[in-house]
């Protein structure tokens, strides 16, 4: 067992983690722990762009962007955070440009911009060109650019170090972050990282769904680590289902395709979004478009022999436009479906895409232990966090913006905290939980298989907690997850070795997914309304009287060791925009 000491430790090396690292390393001795090589992080899969009211192509301003973000989040957005996001967006894009990111350009040389769902001119009058993009590889370009700048700044990376536990020490009645415990995949060794400040930037939770755009590594590791230590998770019932995933595979086809003029059609060739969103049409918010697609399918207007998908039609767009603006998704259509997008429409269906909920933070990235209390030395940014800038539904291109704006803020805040803070004493036997977990799983002779339990979890979530939900479907999910959690106690793995034990890694990840899926389902069951990505067919309307509030879920352990979930609620921060009916 090895012990390391740093001023700041960052968990995760995607966009938020590396943006934080660039700022933190300038101000404090920083280590970045990542279970992947940094450029394999899921930020690289983001395609469409990064929102900022640059007004390079059309009139725009940050206040319109703020309004669209609040409206898009179905008014569950904390508006102070939304204002910061929109105001700082312009500098965030220009910072990346200065770092070397190759944005697409207008003929006069400025950063080009295109339309994206839910982004509008003058508070909803018409779509606006706000998305700054690098073809349909924007996330990839951001990831590469940030990594190059991390290397330039001398950031210390610990690659393939899997953080399994958050260390909390109580000092004078105040719970403080003391560091993290990590498992080194190459050797099987346990490492303790003592740090004055810890930033979680470990990404989302989407692998508890089967049809998902998320990478295999998005298993909620950061959320699970802090949740086990008694800290809350916020708004976990809100999960975004992107309208255009490749049929049956879930691989993302960017919203930028519709921003460039792509059209959604049913089996009759009808542009059906005109019925559901007369102004924004195919560029309505993602929750609206995904529900519209499933409504078409349910009412018998789906495409194909089984009527289980619709079409994304790009055939009316010039091939040179597709090649220049959408090279990756046209290649995806050819590779995965054998379809030529120049001449044939692409079969699509909604895919689980993004967690709006996560570890609750304030606008500086400081983690909260309840509605207002900060955990000294603990920070989070990106999809792992809930600031809450996305509310009940995230707008496209606000994610790449979020990781840059709040990743930067968390990096600065954590480093500055480390200047004045002392190291917190480590708990007695700090690696006890991780050693017990690793050895129990590695030496288990149980009969349950990780792959079987994971498949049953994913099928349960797809069937019961996806775009449309009811009391009965959510209860079915809660009961099935409880059964799977019980069976997980008898899980066995084949590989008993220490080095690169991927069987062990997958077993640990499954445990995280089971914990978080239960939180999501229990939170969804309690929210008896429809709002954004959470749609209850038995409660189809938004209820601002009873549910204009954030859900806070806490893990509680009884004297007999039984676990339960306690739900509490936190008020929404409203500054200038009062809730209205959402129309697109």
Features from the language model and the residues they span:
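Glycine- and aromatic-enriched mobile tails/lids
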Residues: 1-6, 15, 23, 37-39, ...
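N-terminal Rossmann-like FAD-binding beta1-loop-alpha1 element of flavoenzymes
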Residues: 8-32
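Glycine-rich active-site loop/strand segments that organize a redox cofactor
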Residues: 52-85
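Short beta-strand to alpha-helix junction loop
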Residues: 77-90, 129-148, 158, 212-220, ...
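Conserved redox-cofactor binding core of oxidoreductases
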Residues: 97-189, 194, 201, 242-249, ...
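FAD-site-proximal beta/loop scaffold in flavoenzymes
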Residues: 165-192, 340-387
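Glycine-rich loop(s) and the adjacent beta-strand/alpha-helix scaffold that form part
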Residues: 197-251, 304, 396-413
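An anion/pyrophosphate-binding glycine-rich loop and adjacent beta-alpha core
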Residues: 225, 231-347, 413-419, 454, ...
